[in-house]
Amino acid sequence: MAEITKQDVIEYIEKMSVLELSELVKELEEKFGVSAAAPVAVAAAGPATADAAAAEEKTEFDVILKAAGANKINVIKVVRALTSLGLKEAKDLVDGAPGAVKTGVSKQEAEDAQKQLVEAGAEVEVK
């Protein structure tokens, strides 16, 4: 019997949709009692930390669908176009709002996605 390698797992995960990845993360968090959220920085560092954070410009953004709005069909179409998800996966993502439509994208790509989703009637947030 062939042994599954780390590379096999990585290749399998690469083929998963955004919705499937989200569900996988939730299941792993529950199974191992951990959180995938980034730890909150301690605020006791003082004003020097605030200056450093302001100087470092954010380069990766997440596009979060907060609500589908009244025109859900158009929002699903835009989500499919932006993510290459199938119809069912895109519908599940829209129905399960709030959820990430795109993660780790450039500022321009995030703004374009936000514009398209808002035009379709969705409520969107860029983080």
Curated annotation (Swiss-Prot):
Q: Which Pfam families match?
A: Ribosomal_L12, Ribosomal_L12_N
The alphabetized UniProt keywords are: Ribonucleoprotein, Ribosomal protein
Q: Where is the signal peptide?
A: none
S-S bonds: none
Question: What Gene3D superfamilies does the annotation carry?
Answer: 3.30.1390.10, Single helix bin
Q: Which GO terms describe its biological process?
A: translation
Q: Which GO terms describe its cellular component?
A: cytosolic large ribosomal subunit
Molecular-function GO term, any one: mRNA binding
What does the similarity note say?
A: Belongs to the bacterial ribosomal protein bL12 family.
What role does this protein play? Forms part of the ribosomal stalk which helps the ribosome interact with GTP-bound translation factors. Is thus essential for accurate translation.
HAMAP family recorded: Ribosomal_bL12
Q: Which NCBIfam families match?
A: L12 (TIGR00855)
**Assembly and interaction partners:** Homodimer. Part of the ribosomal stalk of the 50S ribosomal subunit. Forms a multimeric L10(L12)X complex, where L10 forms an elongated spine to which 2 to 4 L12 dimers bind in a sequential fashion. Binds GTP-bound translation factors.
Q: What is the name of this protein? A: Large ribosomal subunit protein bL12
Protein's organism: Pelobacter propionicus (strain DSM 2379 / NBRC 103807 / OttBd1)
